[in-house]
């Protein structure tokens, strides 16, 4: 009996076709010709083979993934083109920052327009000044400053004048006379004021020892005040003229309170 190989498991199976063919030949042979020779039938082993079944899990190709990537790239390109065509607007946080910066800039501009240098303005000096009539009668030396609110040099020097004033206000009078006030016409003529700021330095009897006009170093002003406070007969800087504003540019107006020394 022949043996065949199974396709899937590799088991040896008998060859039924060959066995049936032999059986038919034996029946067709005449009985007279039959010889009974005992003979062992040989088994023929068929060739062993195993045909592996086709793998049902076939590897998938990369075409779908490639198509997906291509689709995503097209979508991104389309989105980018739309963004390029549409204007971008700042978010709310950026808008708040811009508004805050604008507010700070406006406050800074307002402070600059006041020219409140060093935190001190001409109005501060005028408010703390000694009235002119009192200064002439209290027996102290006096510094008289002729100024105007529109005088830029006057505003620049205000912090330096204030610092010196705070040091010597107990020994020296500091008087502020606004040239726009018609009340001081006589004093303008008496001291020969042609430019401002004009600083006149008077001894304790009210006699002028010197004057300084316009922008000057802080040390000049301090030296003259120290000389007055020390009772010296003269001041070291008696005739100094720097950059000043012309008194001819003054805006004359009558103040409501004639007692005001501003």
Curated annotation (Swiss-Prot):
User: Superkingdom of this entry's organism?
Assistant: Eukaryota
Disulphide bridges? 151-154
Q: What would be an example GO MF term here?
A: oxidoreductase activity, acting on a sulfur group of donors, disulfide as acceptor
The alphabetical list of record keywords is: Chloroplast, Disulfide bond, Electron transport, Plastid, Redox-active center, Transit peptide, Transport
Q: Which Pfam families match?
A: Thioredoxin
Could you tell me which residues belong to the region Disordered?
47-90
Gene Ontology terms describing biological process: cytochrome b6f complex assembly
Could you point out where the transit peptide sits in the sequence?
Answer: 1-54
UniProt-annotated location(s): Plastid, Chloroplast
Q: Where is the composition biased (Basic and acidic residues)?
A: 64-76
Q: Which CDD domains match?
A: TxlA (cd02950)
Q: What is its main location?
A: plastid
Q: Which residues does the UniProt record annotate as the domain Thioredoxin? A: 78-230
Role of this protein: Probable thiol-disulfide oxidoreductase that may participate in various redox reactions in the chloroplast.
Q: Of which family is this protein a member? A: Belongs to the thioredoxin family.
Name-wise, this protein is Thioredoxin-like protein HCF164, chloroplastic
Please give the organism. Answer: Oryza sativa subsp. japonica
